[in-house]
Amino acid sequence: MELLPLYVGKEGVVAIGEIGYDDQTEAEDKFYRLQLELAKEVDLPVLIHTPHRDKRKGTIRSMDVSEEHGLDPKMVIVDHNNEETVKEVLDRGYYAGFTIYPHTKRGSERMVEIVKQYGPERIIVNSAADWGISDPLAVPKTADLMRKSGIPEEHIKMVTYQNALTAFGQSGQMDEQDWLNAAPLDQTKKMSGNSVLRGGQTPRVEGSSDFVEN
């Protein structure tokens, strides 16, 4: 905990997290509360990890403690939701994240049904590569399935892009213009005589990055 304040102000830090409970121990509770206070102090969004076991109980506890420490629900993304937790998370004003894994947690088909039932507001579809079998294309594959299932394009964009941008953009460190109108790349330039290149690498010179919307 002593080191975290040294990093939260660095460029590109968009949230504190994932933080929260897994086994729901006293130690987890202690540090969860300390990290919530840090997030409040530096005015950053919070990304909450909900436990694998007793998920509903742990999710409710996570929100209760967050509110106890005075965090605004709109600044908090509660991740790894399922059918048991999503209604209460949304009803209480939080962002509800859903992690898509190929064979566990949340399949694309189930995600489609959740968006159909609850709509696109404050729902964030994401993927992960932290353990087990993962798929870096899980989000676009889920978007394609939503499209085939008749979900409006505007709703698909919200749950796979815009809601995450809105939530994490509250940090002041995330602006889509950074990639829509990215500066040209020129690795021949040096800063105070120093180059980013190492070991005889060939410098790259490119125009502005292209961002393609489907």
Show which residues each predicted segment covers.
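Conserved, mostly hydrophobic/aromatic
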Residues: E18, A39, A96, A128, ...
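Short loop/helix-cap segments at secondary-structure boundaries that form the rim of catalytic
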Residues: V86-G93
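Short acidic/histidine-rich active-site segments
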Residues: Y118-P136, I156
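Mid-to-C-terminal alpha-helical segments outside catalytic/metal-binding sites
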Residues: P140, D144-N214
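Short acidic active-site motifs
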Residues: E84-T85, R110
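Active-site glycine- and acidic-residue-rich loops that bind
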Residues: F98-S108
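Short helix-capping segments at alpha-helix termini
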Residues: E68-D72, Y118-G119, K148-P152
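Divalent metal-binding pocket/active-site signature
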Residues: E2-E84
